[in-house]
C-alpha cells in the first residue's frame, strides 16, 4: 500500500541485507514489484553504510526504506544503518523515509528482548515519514497491518484505490482499540502475549509443580528448567528462561504422546527424547484441564 502510493515507477533504496522473506514465501522484492516500485539494492548482505544510501539517491528516488530483520539475524562482520540516520538523509534529500518494523513493541520487554526489536515509541521520536508494523506479534493484538506517520502522507494513502479491498472490519478495529486501551491503563494482564512474557519464573515453577502433583500417579512427570523461543516472526534466535514438565507413559514413544496431545489441542514439543510442556504458555486455569 505504501509503496504503491508513493513509489510506483520510482526507485526505493533498500539494503541487500534487509531483503527478507517472511512466512508463506512473501518476499520484499516480489512485494515491491507487485506495488509497481523499482527496487534499488544498496550495500552488501552483511554491511551497508549511510554513504550507500547517499550515493544511490537520484532524481527518480522516491523513498529510503528500512526493513527489520524480524525472523533472522546476521552476526559477525556486519553492520547496518540506524533508522535515525536514514530519516535525516531522506529529509535532506526531500524523499520519504519508511521503516517496515515487522513486529514493533510499545513497552520495554523483559529479558532484554527490546535490545534488537524496534520500539514504536522510540522510533517516533525521530519524526519519521512512515512506519508500519503488525497488530499481532509483540503488540499482542489482532492480525493486521498498521501504518502511522505524517498526516499528509496518511491522507494520500487513504485515497489509494486498494484501501477499499484491504481495510479491516469494525470488529478488528474494536479489538485493536481495546488492546491499545490496555496499554494506556498499563493493564498488561489483558494482553496475553505480554502476560506470558512477564510471568515470573517462580509462578511458572509453581504451575509446573501443580500439574506434576496431579498426574504423578498415571505417568512419569518431571519438572525442569527450560528455554522458550519467542517465535512468531520476532526476536530471532532469542530464548528466555522458563519451566516445563516432561511426560513419559508406559511404552509410548514421545512422538505418539505428542500426537495424542495435539489431537486434544495441547501443544507440546520433544526435547532430549522426552515430551515437554512449556509453562511459559500454560495458564493457571488450564492446569486442571491438562491433568484430565
Segments (PLM) and residue ranges:
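Flexible, glycine/charged-enriched surface loops at secondary-structure junctions
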Residues: 94-98, 135, 166-171, 186-192, ...
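Conserved C-terminal alpha-helix-loop-beta "cap" of PLP-dependent enzymes
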Residues: 205-283
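Short, low-order "capping/linker" segments at domain edges
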Residues: 280-292
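Extended hydrophobic-aromatic, low-complexity segments
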Residues: 156-157, 189, 254-258
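Composition- and surface-driven signal marking solvent-exposed, interaction-prone regions
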Residues: 160-161, 272, 290-292
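Conserved PLP-enzyme active-site core in the AAT-like
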Residues: 1-181, 216
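Conserved PLP-dependent catalytic core of the aminotransferase class-I/II
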Residues: 14, 172-173, 177-231
